[in-house]
Amino acid sequence: VGEHVPPLRLRDRNLTFSADGSVWCNYLLTGINVNSYQPDTATAAQDSHELLYAALSQIPTDDIMITGFKYRKNPLDTMNAITGGIPDWDPVRYRYLGSLLDDLYRRMCSGKEFVEFDRLYWIAISQPTSRRMTERLVSTVVDVDPLEGMDWADLEEFEKHCFNSLPIEFRPRRATPEFVDWAFERATTRGLSIPMLPPLVDPDDPNTPRFKPTEKAYPEVMFDEAAEATALYSTYLTDLENGRKYTQNLSKVDRKRSLFKRFRTLAGGKIMSISHPSKRTASLPDGPVSYQSLFGIARYPARFDEAVSKFTYIVDQAIDADADFTLRVRFSQDLVETRSVSNTEKDLVSEGTANASDEFEAHEYDTKRAELRRFHTAIRDESGPIGMQMAAIFAFGSDDLDHLQSRVSALQMKFRKNGYTPLLPVGGQKDLWTMMMPGSRRTKLGDDLLQTSTAHWFSGAMPLRRSFAGDPVGMPIAINKENALGQIILLDILNATNQGNASMAFTGAQGRGKSHALKLIFLFVTALNRYASVVDHSPHGEWAVFALQVARTQVVNAATGFTYAGYRSMDPLKCLPSPEAEIVMQAHYLPLFEIDSKTSEAAYFAKILNADFRKVRGITSTRRLMEWLATAGEPEARLLLFNFEHWAALPYSRAFIDPPRRSHDDDGYPPFDNIAELAQRMEDGTTPHATVFRTNGLPVYRGKNPKGATDQNKWAAAVYGSIARMTAFRFSQIRGTCVFFADEISFLKGNEDVVELLIRSPDRIGRKDGNFLAAGSQHADDYDENYAMIEKKGALGQKTRENAIAALSHIDMPVLDSLIDMIINQTSPPDPDNPKIVRAGRHGEGWWNDGTITVRCQYFPILSAVLARFADTTTSRMIRESDLDEHGSLRSAAAGRHAANAEAA
């Protein structure tokens, strides 16, 4: 039967009673979120830590344990967070999204992909006890009840005081007995597996099942405090068996004793092992073995400043080892009194005089005295210093002894480079391990590791910290790479505008994943049965190709009127009701005709566009309006007709102006969509729908002199304005979230209609209607003052220094040479064997700013291999619109470049 280490006598709610008579109050805390790229958040986190230390210093205790335990997040919790942002979640209603999430859940449960971890901060506070040392020693050999004479009322009062002292910023919760079991499992399997947390229940809830946990039913484990010696002895036995030369002349007795004669210190190890015999197999007779190495910090950097220290945060980095940490803390004002500092200096002088044998050893003592004087100066300059001592312990685990040895050596070197002196006590591994466990006292070794500081200065270490980005609920869009915990970043699409501006802007060089990130969000918008509108001006129709696979998508060529259902019209008189139709017509044509809005021609145009005027004359389209103008005799009519005929004759105006009628009952092209019907479909919420406007035949004017624009440039500007007005009207008719996607937004520059309707207006008032913009650009400078209110921003890899600087500024990150190098050379780097493609496994790397926190991340892949194929824009693998048949489906595989496309189909 297994027993807890250290032995426990009783667990009651969040109280732990150890066999040595100590009583502990246990709490679970959440780390303070820190933005590594914004000093203000680090300062706030330091202030919170100083507040925590100040609160703990008021608790009458001499022993506090703060441990950071790593745990694996339950995939089901992540799934609940994803669906938690959907008010009417129903797997039937959202069948397509459900299939994507089912696949994601299977991949998460496999443990190979999308595995999330986090860190639980455990704080245990010892209640002061009056038991003498002799009583505690007796309790270890004689069965003495440690609870005899316990003042339960005093204990309850102490526990309340402890809980109420913890600052709310850390979201304190009372631990339960199940968490002690979990902590034991975590500590004994470090490096083997990372267990999920038990459910946290309220022990005072009457519905909570009541039980008294036994302290004799822990999993049985075996400790080997000299794991390296065991491994070395195994190698020695193998050499004996193989008849290695150095073993051939040994007698039978010497064969047994030779190893330990050669290496006399092997009984005390630097690495210990914890085996699980209850899980033994034929290949693992001792069961799975966790190799662990622990060290403390014997000396801290010889500086006192407020710089952010990563210190304990190293356990969350990509160190290629499983790791936890513990701080054993005590507080005393005696530590910062001048008398105490003076006595310490006298001791150093005496030790130096007695022990220094030469000038170099004497110099070491002089250095320590200089550090002491700097410390005294620092606390004198601090207002109301709170003295504290802390012993820092780090534990690293692996299932491979050799690997652990190499990693611990590298980590020790890393600590030394940062000014810390690690102490790896030979023979003291289990002592350190035990001090990391709930219910354990600080030992003599722990006392030796205590280092003196103040609450203010040690707050710079920020041991209780985290880097969490994204929304509490929503769709998965990225993996947090700020550390190695792998948090899945969520984006709340349906409720995005509740907290204000919801628009987002991405920037990244071609081939670095910008369009991929936008398509991922588009996929989720449509899978949520919401409406999306896209302007696709790519020459190969990359958005049309992708959208046709994920939603009931309508693709209309804004120049020719081509759709996969036949030619359609974007004529405002056909597509919009009154008065929207009149507004769009005037905004579209008056600038083209170079007619001022205050002229008689403009007034005449407004009169004939009136719905009542058109109704009695059968004017249902722009072509019929032109026919009526041909019969009118007013000079204004002749001028309007002249201009209409000019533009109607151009090949790129067909989508807005029907060809001449072939017969009296020829109504021309039907409207590309019935907007009223669309609104009703979206109200039903059952059919995702998207519109893609193909505008590749409509180039915008890039020059600064408006007179240099060609007719095609002028018509393109008018078309973009009409698309913006139609889209804005659609959004206004649909209840719920609508999203406008604009990739490579440089085409919008200078078009005030589009900028106002689809960028500035949603930023100001779109949140009231749930609408927002998702934009992308290769160069961040395209995001001018019109995008100033956008808070959510993404940045992916860049290829030039100029673009890298603009991208860093865009995402509110400091422009540092190290970050410039990272965004150019270390973000989705090219494959070393083929520089034209991104290195395997490095696609979509970049940063995400959720409006509050910025983190380095890797954007999610498209959650379907087939869909990912249609989203791929790599030149050699890209599916072009020309590869689709007349129904929008992929053509049969043909020889040559697209022969592999049959697999995508």
Where are these regions (language model features)?
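Extended, folded cores of ATP/NTP-driven motor/assembly subunits in large transport
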Residues: 1-445
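The Walker A/P-loop phosphate-binding site
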Residues: 2-20, 259-268, 274-278, 287, ...
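Switch/coupling segment of Walker-type NTPase motor domains
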Residues: 33, 68-98, 109-112, 516-615
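P-loop NTPase motor domains
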Residues: 43-58, 433-488, 537, 570-764, ...
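A generic structural motif
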Residues: 67, 172-182, 325-330, 419-431, ...
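P-loop NTPase motor core of the ASCE superfamily
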Residues: 110-111, 577-623, 782-905
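Phosphate-binding P-loop/Walker A region and its immediate neighborhood
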Residues: 198-214, 220-221, 231, 240-244, ...
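Conserved P-loop NTPase motor cores
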Residues: 352-353, 487, 493-512, 517-522, ...
